[in-house]
């Protein structure tokens, strides 16, 4: 198109269609902006393959342009620092890349002058609700508006990622007396011993807190906390020093950062504070290092260190009152005593006629038993894990076990273990059987495999009827024990059953009915021919295909004022890719079977060309229609409509097309019967012809 005046020309990189932005190359083309204001020609933007070409590749009608955006960004690597603007038309968005900021501003200014575009008023708000893609900073600004308006627009138009963030003041500048902080700095925390002049409430702190198990939790002290608005009468002066609320309602001191011993420890073993400090401390019981023996302090340190979280009131442990302090001091060397006390047997019977091996055993740990009742171990007795136990230790153990009182100690085990035991006496008999065999009485004979082939058969009591299975592994014991008397004693440790065969691995007997074969994985079979899984080929999602340059904080949009410049009707030559003519075709009736169109007429719109409006595409269809008409020549009823349709397709008369849009049922049935009759006659003719030739 050479009728218009050339306003601007130069090299620009053009984007492919929106659905091919990332897969197709951005071609460098020679663009020419023409204005038909003086010549009467339409305003167009043409681009050529090079600056010497005479025929444009495409003509963009600026009358269809709706908006121009300048200062876009694209997340493609080669366009990180590019100057991108777009021309938004009715049919497509053209993204153009300029070589410099000046070129981009020049093109945008010229296009806006021709189209009559002005900066949009709602543009400063658009970046806040625009695309979800995060825009990147652009190294340029638009100079189509005054500098003052640009500064004002840029200050208002910045989305949240680009706004200046006002940092809050440093925590050091804020006084702690304003509001309690969520976090405390370790710089402001101090840890020291209580002073004599401190309040009665603070004197209840244990003096060993800075050297015992609470070294990792500093005792927070802040001098400014005395001015807190929460301080009523000086009694709650240290409420601000802790980052979590106190553990009890009546306690607001810093004792929440220390480990609070349960109430049960303070009955007979712990030396209490003065009554005044105990009342001030509420439910908390503490003790000081100077008062009390070294054995008690050592025992309590073991207790406090071994718990990460204080137990609930229903799960506290009771220490037997008959144990002397020396016994506690000796037993404090055992690491497993505070956590897992050994199981408790019933009252011991005279043991003069039993051997040491049959009458006594070392208490078992938590991994060997799940009983809900335990007794403390004898003083000075450590759980031996060897295969032999001296007679002296066994006698001492039996003596201590028979002379001490036993107390029930609830244990924090899962409910499925403890709830399954009904009676203590029957339960303990079951425990002794489980320790020896691991199964009920009905299953002992069929599941038991003796370790020693020469051992006599097993003898068991008839009271073992409840089928309970040991969750941990249970060793097989030789059949030399008297189970009727053995059930009344402390169960032997796990290693006692392997004295005759220490190399035999442990075996857990399971009923045959409970055994299920593992599932068979056929895919593990060697040389198995399996059909490969179908390839999961997914088309690119829409957001990946339509990923386009996005708006940045300095993007400016220009659009036409609809009141001053109404949109003109869409011309027919908007989709032309090879046209250089500005003439418009007023024919709006689309006839796909017309062989005279789109071959010589270059102004055919895209829908005609896309549907095959050229003469090479129409010729096969025309032959097909002629062949179809030849099939109906024998029927006089259907011939006139077929002739009318043939002539109508060539003359493109609207009334003849309407006759074929409305379907007549009688005519359709008549046409069908005629076609079937002709087909039968033709087939019979073709079958007779070869026979005549053969004769």
From Swiss-Prot:
Alphabetized SMART domains for the sequence: PH (SM00233)
Post-translational modifications reported in the UniProt record: Phosphorylated on tyrosine residue(s) by the epidermal growth factor receptor (EGFR) and the insulin receptor (INSR). Tyrosine phosphorylation of GAB1 mediates interaction with several proteins that contain SH2 domains. Phosphorylated on tyrosine residues by HCK upon IL6 signaling. Phosphorylated in response to FGFR1 activation.
PROSITE patterns, per the entry: PH_DOMAIN
A GO-annotated cellular component: cell cortex
The name this protein goes by in its record: GRB2-associated-binding protein 1
Organism per entry: Mus musculus
PH domain location: 5-116
Family: Belongs to the GAB family.
């Amino acid at each position: 198109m050479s009728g218009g005046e050339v306003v601007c020309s130069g090299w620009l990189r053009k984007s492919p269609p929106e659905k091919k932005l990332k897969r197709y190359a951005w071609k460098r083309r020679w663009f020419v902006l023409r204005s038909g204001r003086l010549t009467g020609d339409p305003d167009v933007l043409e681009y050529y393959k090079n600056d010497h070409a005479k025929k444009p590749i495409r003509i963009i009608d600026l009358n269809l342009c709706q908006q121009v955006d300048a200062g876009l960004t694209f997340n493609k690597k080669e366009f990180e620092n590019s100057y991108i603007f777009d021309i938004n038309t009715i049919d497509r968005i053209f993204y153009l890349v300029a070589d410099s900021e000046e070129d981009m501003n020049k093109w945008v200014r010229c296009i806006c002058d021709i189209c009559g575009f002005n900066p949009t008023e709602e543009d400063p708000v658009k970046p806040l609700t625009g695309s979800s893609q995060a825009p990147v900073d652009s190294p340029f600004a638009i100079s189509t508006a005054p500098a003052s308006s640009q500064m004002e627009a840029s200050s208002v138009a910045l989305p949240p990622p680009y706004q200046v963030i006002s940092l809050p003041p440093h925590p050091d500048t804020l006084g702690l007396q304003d509001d309690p902080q969520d976090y405390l700095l370790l710089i402001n925390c101090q840890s020291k011993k209580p002073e004599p002049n401190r309040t009665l409430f603070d004197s209840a702190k244990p003096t060993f807190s800075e050297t015992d198990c609470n070294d990792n939790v500093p005792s927070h002290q802040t001098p400014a906390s005395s001015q807190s608005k929460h301080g009523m009468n000086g009694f709650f002066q240290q409420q601000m020093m802790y980052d979590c609320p106190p553990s009890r309602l009546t306690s607001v001191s810093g004792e929440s950062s220390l480990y609070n011993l349960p109430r049960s420890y303070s009955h007979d073993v712990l030396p209490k504070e003065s009554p005044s400090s105990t009342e001030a401390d509420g439910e908390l019981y503490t003790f000081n290092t100077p008062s009390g023996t070294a054995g008690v302090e050592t025992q309590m340190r073991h207790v406090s260190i071994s718990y990460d979280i204080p137990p609930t009131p229903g799960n506290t442990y009771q220490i037997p009152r008959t144990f002397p302090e020396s016994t506690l001091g000796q037993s404090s060397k055992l690491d497993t005593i505070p956590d897992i006390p050994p199981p408790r047997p019933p009252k011991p019977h005279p043991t003069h006629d039993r051997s040491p091996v049959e009458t006594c055993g070392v208490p078992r740990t938590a991994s060997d038993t799940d009983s809900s009742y335990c007794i403390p171990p004898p003083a000075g007795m450590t759980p031996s894990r060897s295969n032999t136990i001296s007679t002296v230790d066994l006698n001492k153990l039996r003596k201590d076990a028979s002379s001490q009182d036993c107390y029930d100690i609830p244990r924090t085990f899962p409910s499925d273990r403890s709830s399954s035991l009904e009676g203590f006496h029957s339960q303990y008999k079951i425990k002794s059987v489980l320790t020896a065999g691991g199964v009920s009485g009905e299953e002992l004979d069929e599941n038991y495999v003796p370790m020693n082939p020469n051992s006599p058969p097993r003898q068991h009591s008839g009271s073992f009827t409840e089928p309970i299975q040991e969750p941990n592994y249970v060793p097989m014991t030789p059949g030399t024990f008297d189970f009727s008397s053995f059930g009344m004693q402390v169960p032997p440790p796990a290693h006692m059953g392997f004295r005759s065969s220490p190399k035999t691995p442990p075996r857990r007997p399971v009923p045959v009915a409970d055994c299920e074969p593992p599932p068979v994985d056929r895919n593990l079979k060697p040389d198995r021919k399996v059909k490969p899984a179908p390839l999961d080929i997914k088309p690119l999602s829409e957001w990946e295909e339509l990923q386009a340059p996005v708006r940045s904080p300095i993007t400016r949009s220009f659009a036409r004022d609809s009141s001053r410049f109404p949109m003109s009707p869409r011309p027919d030559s908007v989709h032309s890719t090879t046209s250089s003519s500005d003439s418009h075709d007023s024919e709006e009736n689309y006839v796909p079977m017309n062989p005279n169109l789109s071959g010589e007429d270059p102004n055919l719109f895209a829908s005609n060309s896309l549907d095959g409006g050229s003469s090479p595409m129409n010729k096969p269809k025309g032959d097909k229609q002629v062949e179809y008409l030849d099939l109906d020549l024998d029927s006089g009823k259907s011939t006139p409509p077929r002739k009318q349709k043939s002539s109508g397709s060539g003359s493109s008369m609207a009334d003849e097309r309407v006759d074929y849009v409305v379907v007549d049922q009688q005519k359709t049935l008549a046409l069908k019967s005629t076609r079937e009759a002709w087909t039968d006659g033709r087939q019979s003719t073709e079958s007779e012809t070869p026979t005549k030739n053969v004769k």
